[in-house]
Amino acid sequence: MAALAASIATSTAFAAKPRLSRPPARLSVSCSASSGDNNNSTATPSLSASIKTFSAALALSSVLLSSAATSPPPAAADIAGLTPCKESKAFAKREKQSVKKLNSSLKKYAPDSAPALAIQATIDKTKRRFENYGKFGLLCGSDGLPHLIVSGDQRHWGEFITPGVLFLYIAGWIGWVGRSYLIAVSGEKKPAMREIIIDVELAARIIPRGFIWPVAAYRELINGDLVVDDADIGY
């Protein structure tokens, strides 16, 4: 009886162990299956979204390339924001408006009258000015007006450097002639009257000397005659 009871207890113990081990096995299988389903369901929408994004980007690039190939390139220059005047639509429009305004004024006068001839000369001068702006490569802005480039670029020296040097030369010539005239009349009895009433004969002799004012100024600077002492200046 004791042996029979022991065998029954042993068989009961062995029979209970599989019952306890089955549920964890089933739980693990079910978890792995659900995880796989979630991954598949998540991967499918992301893949379709990537395909749609790539297709949209490809279509957009095709449209941009086709438009760039068919449309002519815009007129551009070496300075940002500026366009060569001969290629600027705003510049051509401004020229057309200027000539049109002068032509409307020309119609008010007889063909051979003095005002008509003066207006016609102005029209010719206006056309020539706009033509020169385009011929010499000036750059225009969005307003259609030429812009001077003062950055020191050698390609645009003719727009600013050359006129600037010419202006300084003319201004120096005028100043040197005036200085020479004041020095010439300073030794007279009433120099102030010579400043008010200009001696034309004396001024006519001094004016031609002013054309070499850079050389004359350098010579006086070397000799010490260009600047006077403070003691010789009257207050």
Swiss-Prot record:
Keyword Cell cycle annotated: no
Keyword annotations from UniProtKB, A to Z: Chloroplast, Photosynthesis, Photosystem I, Plastid, Thylakoid, Transit peptide
Entry annotated with the keyword Ribonucleoprotein: no
Top-level lineage group: Eukaryota
GO biological process, one term: photosynthesis
Subcellular location: Plastid, Chloroplast thylakoid lumen
InterPro entries: PSI_PsaF (IPR003666), PSI_PsaF_sf (IPR036577)
Any one Gene Ontology cellular component term annotated for this protein: chloroplast thylakoid lumen
Transit peptide: 1-77
Function: Probably participates in efficiency of electron transfer from plastocyanin to P700 (or cytochrome c553 in algae and cyanobacteria). This plastocyanin-docking protein contributes to the specific association of plastocyanin to PSI.
PANTHER family according to UniProt: PHOTOSYSTEM I REACTION CENTER SUBUNIT III, CHLOROPLASTIC
Family (UniProt): Belongs to the PsaF family.
Name of protein: Photosystem I reaction center subunit III, chloroplastic
Name of the gene: PSAF
